[in-house]
Every structure is written in structure tokens, then in C-alpha cells.
Amino acid sequence: EQMDAAGEIKKANSDAVRQCLNNAGAYLLFREKKEEGGAILKYALQLSDRDGININENITSSNTLGMMGSILLKEDQPVTCEGLYLQALEVFDKKKTMTRPELFDYSKACDGYSQLLVKWDKRERLGEQYQQKASELLMKMSENADWMFPLTSRFWTPTLFKWDFAY
């Protein structure tokens, strides 16, 4: 907010600033600080709005939406949570090519949505499909990498995944 007040956030660096906010929000969510993480993610979306960025077409904003969905998943607000995940997944689905960090974010959104779906009656199968997609995206991310899980330029949060998922 201090950078914003000082006029240091420009359209040219807006994506990078919003990604840093996403990283900070992800870290706070990992530390179970939902309110603080949510406030930071909300601010990232406010910056998008202020800069005239269409969040339905911007990959950084879709990452923010997916993380906000994870907050609502923890707060047991399934309907709003589903809307956020679907909105985020729609942006990822439209993108023809992705960088490894984008694949990782896409995988996180698929994983979060799968966790929501397996909690609902008669949607478990779809949840399993999204979990499979999340796993496939992680494997795609590691193609041509020197090791199984290459570092990304985004915040690495492997403990947010359910690695023991049986499929």
C-alpha cells in the first residue's frame, strides 16, 4: 500500500507487484493466517481493477482468484468458492501455452477445486478428475527438468497439495 500511495506501482510493473502480493498471500494462507492473506489477495484484485485489468483474461489475477477460493474452502463457503475456482480455471483453460509457474498455479487451482468437489455428494468423481488433472500438470511442469520438481519463480508451496491422493 505504501508503494501504491507513493505512486510507485505503474502499469508496467503491476503484474510483478500483484504476483508478489499473491506470494505473500499464499505464505500467510500456508501459515493459517486467512484474514491477513485474504486482505492481501483482495488488495491485489483492487490493483487489477484500478489498472483496468480484466481479471477474466489475466493469468496473475486468475492465480489470485484461485487462492481466494482456497480461503473460502477453509471457511466452508462452497458456493462462492466454486465460483472463484471456476473463474480462475476458465482463464487457465483458455491459455494455449504456459510457463512452468503458470502450470504450477493451474495445478494448484485444479487441486483446490478437486478438494471442494470431493466434499459434495455426487461430485466426487469430478473431484477425482480435477485431482488427476492437477497431478498431470505437475508432471508436465517437470518435463525436461533436471529434477522432479523444478523451482519456479513463484512461491513454492508443495505442502498445500494432497500428495497422498490415491487414483
Map each language-model feature to its residues.
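Amphipathic alpha-helical segments of tetratricopeptide repeats
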Residues: 1-8, 42-53, 86-97, 135-139
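Residue at a conserved register position within TPR or TPR-like alpha-solenoid repeats
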Residues: 28, 65, 72, 110, ...
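TPR-repeat structural position
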Residues: 34, 78, 123-124
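Residue register of alpha-helical TPR repeats
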Residues: 12, 19, 60-63, 83, ...
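"A position-specific structural signal for the A-helix of alpha-solenoid helical repeats
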Residues: 16, 22-23, 60, 66-67, ...
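Terminal, low-structured helical/coil segments at or just beyond the last alpha-helical repeat
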Residues: 112, 119-167
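Structural motif corresponding to the intra-repeat A-B loop/turn of tetratricopeptide repeats
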Residues: 31, 68, 75, 120-121
